[in-house]
Regions:
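Membrane-embedded hydrophobic alpha-helical segments
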Residues: 1-28
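Amphipathic, non-membrane alpha-helical segments in soluble helical-bundle scaffolds
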Residues: 2, 6, 30-37, 74
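A sequence-composition feature that detects small, non-aromatic residues
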Residues: 10-11, 15, 43-46, 60, ...
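Amphipathic, membrane-active segments
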Residues: 26-67
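An amphipathic alpha-helical interaction surface
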Residues: 65-181
């Protein structure tokens, strides 16, 4: 009887490990097939960020912003990224330009780095690999890099002239999104 229980336990454990490994490999292969991380790296390291790189970032984000978000979460910062990319795209599309201001380029670089960092953290986390089992894990503390990303982008936007419509744009997006305006 003990041998049967031990055998069943070993088989169950083997099945769980196999499923976990298959799931992890599946996620990894999707990343390598699409090459989106590589495209984001290329965009972030480009000498000059143009509308093309803005569209690469926007494409890597969700289709629509999340409706209700909590400050300093990834959903929150990705909403800011979405609104900012859409703003930049419209601004330069209307004027048929592709060259962004230096500050705009740096904000896009910061956003791309944040997206890459979040993806790395997500894939590196053992807990994230168990999401297919519907085991929900809420971190008690949000990753610090999200707050740092917001602070860097906000600081860069404040280097524009006070009369520029983009001065404090990151903060304005946040206030509007969070209902403070």
């Amino acid at each position: 009887m003990n041998e049967l229980v031990i055998g069943l336990f070993a088989a169950l454990l083997g099945a769980i490990v196999s499923i976990f490994t298959l799931y992890t490999n599946y996620r990894s292969s999707l990343d390598s097939i699409s090459g989106w991380r590589s495209k984001l790296f290329d965009a972030a390291s480009a000498k000059e960020i143009t509308l093309k790189e803005v569209q690469v970032l926007r494409t890597a984000l969700r289709y629509e912003p999340t409706r209700k978000v909590q400050e300093y979460t990834f959903a929150w910062i990705s909403n800011i990224m979405i609104y900012y990319c859409d703003y930049i795209s419209l601004k330069y599309f209307e004027h048929h330009e592709t060259s962004l201001l230096y500050q705009e380029q740096e904000i896009i670089r910061v956003f791309i780095r944040c997206l890459l960092k979040n993806h790395w953290e997500y894939n590196a986390s053992m807990v994230s690999s168990l999401k297919f089992l519907k085991i929900h894990y809420k971190a008690s503390k949000q990753p610090e890099f999200i707050r740092e990303t917001y602070d860097k982008a906000k600081a860069i936007s404040r280097t524009l002239e006070n009369d520029d419509e983009e001065y404090d744009l990151i903060e304005k997006i946040n206030k509007k999104m969070m209902g403070s305006v």
